[in-house]
Amino acid sequence: MIGDLLLFGTLLVNAGAVLNFKLKKKESQGFGDDLTEATTGDNIREFLLSLRYFRIFIALWNIFMMFCMIVLFGS
Protein backbone atom coordinates (compact mmCIF):
# COMPACT_ATOMS: atom_id res chain seq x y z
CA MET A 1 0.00 0.00 0.00
CA ILE A 2 2.72 2.48 0.97
CA GLY A 3 4.78 1.39 -2.02
CA ASP A 4 1.85 2.07 -4.34
CA LEU A 5 1.36 5.56 -2.90
CA LEU A 6 5.06 6.38 -3.21
CA LEU A 7 5.08 5.12 -6.78
CA PHE A 8 1.97 7.18 -7.61
CA GLY A 9 3.51 10.34 -6.16
CA THR A 10 6.79 9.76 -7.96
CA LEU A 11 5.09 9.25 -11.31
CA LEU A 12 2.94 12.35 -10.78
CA VAL A 13 5.95 14.56 -10.03
CA ASN A 14 7.83 13.07 -12.99
CA ALA A 15 4.94 13.89 -15.30
CA GLY A 16 4.93 17.49 -14.11
CA ALA A 17 8.70 17.84 -14.43
CA VAL A 18 8.97 16.62 -18.00
CA LEU A 19 6.18 18.68 -19.49
CA ASN A 20 7.77 20.31 -22.49
CA PHE A 21 5.47 23.04 -23.74
CA LYS A 22 5.57 26.78 -23.41
CA LEU A 23 3.66 28.14 -20.44
CA LYS A 24 2.96 31.76 -21.29
CA LYS A 25 1.79 34.50 -18.99
CA LYS A 26 -1.16 36.71 -19.79
CA GLU A 27 -0.40 39.87 -21.70
CA SER A 28 -0.56 42.96 -19.52
CA GLN A 29 -2.92 45.65 -20.75
CA GLY A 30 -1.69 48.56 -18.70
CA PHE A 31 -0.16 49.77 -15.48
CA GLY A 32 -2.98 48.54 -13.24
CA ASP A 33 -2.62 44.85 -14.11
CA ASP A 34 0.32 44.31 -11.76
CA LEU A 35 -1.93 44.67 -8.72
CA THR A 36 -4.32 41.81 -9.59
CA GLU A 37 -4.17 38.58 -7.63
CA ALA A 38 -2.71 35.46 -9.18
CA THR A 39 -5.29 33.07 -10.59
CA THR A 40 -5.28 29.31 -10.10
CA GLY A 41 -3.87 28.90 -13.60
CA ASP A 42 -1.00 31.25 -12.74
CA ASN A 43 -0.24 29.26 -9.60
CA ILE A 44 -0.25 25.95 -11.51
CA ARG A 45 2.04 27.43 -14.16
CA GLU A 46 4.50 28.67 -11.53
CA PHE A 47 4.47 25.26 -9.81
CA LEU A 48 5.19 23.43 -13.07
CA LEU A 49 7.97 25.87 -13.93
CA SER A 50 9.55 25.34 -10.51
CA LEU A 51 9.45 21.56 -11.04
CA ARG A 52 11.57 22.01 -14.16
CA TYR A 53 14.38 23.49 -12.08
CA PHE A 54 14.45 20.44 -9.79
CA ARG A 55 14.90 17.79 -12.51
CA ILE A 56 18.23 16.56 -11.11
CA PHE A 57 16.73 16.06 -7.65
CA ILE A 58 13.74 14.30 -9.18
CA ALA A 59 16.14 11.99 -11.04
CA LEU A 60 17.94 11.18 -7.78
CA TRP A 61 14.57 10.52 -6.12
CA ASN A 62 13.71 8.12 -8.96
CA ILE A 63 16.93 6.19 -8.38
CA PHE A 64 16.17 6.03 -4.66
CA MET A 65 12.63 4.81 -5.38
CA MET A 66 13.94 2.09 -7.69
CA PHE A 67 16.29 0.95 -4.94
CA CYS A 68 13.43 0.90 -2.41
CA MET A 69 11.19 -1.01 -4.79
CA ILE A 70 13.83 -3.71 -5.23
CA VAL A 71 15.03 -3.96 -1.62
CA LEU A 72 12.03 -3.07 0.54
CA PHE A 73 8.93 -3.69 -1.54
CA GLY A 74 10.15 -6.63 -3.61
CA SER A 75 9.09 -10.15 -2.79
UniProtKB/Swiss-Prot annotation:
> Which residue intervals are topologically Cytoplasmic?
75
Report the GO terms under cellular component.
membrane
List where in the cell it is found: Membrane
Superkingdom of this protein's organism:
Eukaryota
The yes or no answer to whether the keyword Membrane is present is yes
Q: Which intervals lie on the Extracellular side per UniProt? A: 18-53
Please state what the protein is called.
Answer: Small integral membrane protein 7-A
Query: What organism is the protein native to?
Result: Xenopus laevis
